[in-house]
């Protein structure tokens, strides 16, 4: 409706609307009525808090309104009146209520607390619950903050392809894209699937990262970023992994690993601070009902410098500590979540950059250090989550990059265009990837990745 006011606007600019007629539209959260008057808590999704509507038997459809089930949609015209002695700061005294849509009486989200596991089974309705309406508003605000940060820094927003013929991570855990008949694909003389007959004429997959394409643009525009969906065919049924998730991937030219870490820290602090400023009600809800120490932790992150250690130093700390881990610690292993959380939660008690990882556990494009054992890579670890950002200085030396690819059995012809970047004005450059869902988990205190993405895609689950 043209003259409808958002509930958020009424809360944020109350003085503008007090004692004036307003029109709102939304869904009934609660309704209680007697023979002569009633109260409706209505929410339109724009704000965490509801607004109370008072109606009486002067309305021509009073009896019909009094019997409306929860989640019915209505439009209300009435006067906004201050209520200084009540629980809510104001209410709308209704002059007219229009029923937009009736809800069935078997609506699953009745007024009681539901488990997150149950709410995942009704993902099409869970945005209407308090926890998930708060989560997805925070997600929206955080996404905007990311764009705002990079645009203010002069970065160029770049769209990288979702369908790709390259494996950025070299891990092979990719979803295949094909139009070949799965029951009877055409075969080569050797009996292998003939991908030259496929739609793209070669093997193609859903992207695991936009980084390689992003480097092309960084070496033209200097500072760029991508923000889009990525896909991993990892059969990991954990609270931290999903098959489809969103990644933020900046690339900066004329930059080394130190520049990369400074950018990551500045971006993370900016986004968290922005969400704290824009979503105080949501974060207070999470602090009260999800994670009691959330606000204290977020304030600490924004106000303190991040720690930094090398991988070798981190391993030494873990080997010397008294804590028993499920996974043994030794130089050369990929740090597990329990190791990362010990470092951030018990030893440093703050976010931590770990740098200079063994080359064997990192990707081919990361710049080789002088020791020929480690690469100029970093992971940012945060309390409660573990790794949230992975980045590196990229290998700009063509001969070193080709040697590393040969060592890993990667075919140069599959990456010919990526290698050509090193022939035409190569320069040092760096970048990182931030898993957006893990960031939202950190900001909200939610502990399962399935609860911070609207319709999660995990092993065995593609519903909705």
UniProtKB/Swiss-Prot annotation:
Write down the InterPro entries for this protein, in alphabetical order: Aa-tRNA-synt_II, aa-tRNA-synth_II, aa-tRNA-synth_II/BPL/LPL, Asn-tRNA-ligase, Asp/Asn-tRNA-synth_IIb, NA-bd_OB-fold, NA-bd_OB_tRNA
Q: Which UniProt keywords apply?
A: Aminoacyl-tRNA synthetase, ATP-binding, Cytoplasm, Ligase, Nucleotide-binding, Protein biosynthesis
Q: Which GO terms describe its molecular function?
A: asparagine-tRNA ligase activity; ATP binding; catalytic activity, acting on a protein; nucleic acid binding; transferase activity
- Quote the cellular component terms of the Gene Ontology held in the record: cytoplasm
Q: Pfam families from the xrefs? A: tRNA-synt_2, tRNA_anti-codon
- Catalytic activity entry: tRNA(Asn) + L-asparagine + ATP = L-asparaginyl-tRNA(Asn) + AMP + diphosphate + H(+)
EC number annotated for this UniProt entry: 6.1.1.22
Q: What class of enzyme is it?
A: ligase
Location in the cell: Cytoplasm
One Gene Ontology term of the biological-process aspect is:
asparaginyl-tRNA aminoacylation
Q: How does it assemble?
A: Homodimer.
Question: Which family, according to the similarity comment?
Answer: Belongs to the class-II aminoacyl-tRNA synthetase family.
Q: What is this protein called?
A: Asparagine--tRNA ligase
Organism in which the protein naturally occurs: Clostridium botulinum (strain Eklund 17B / Type B)
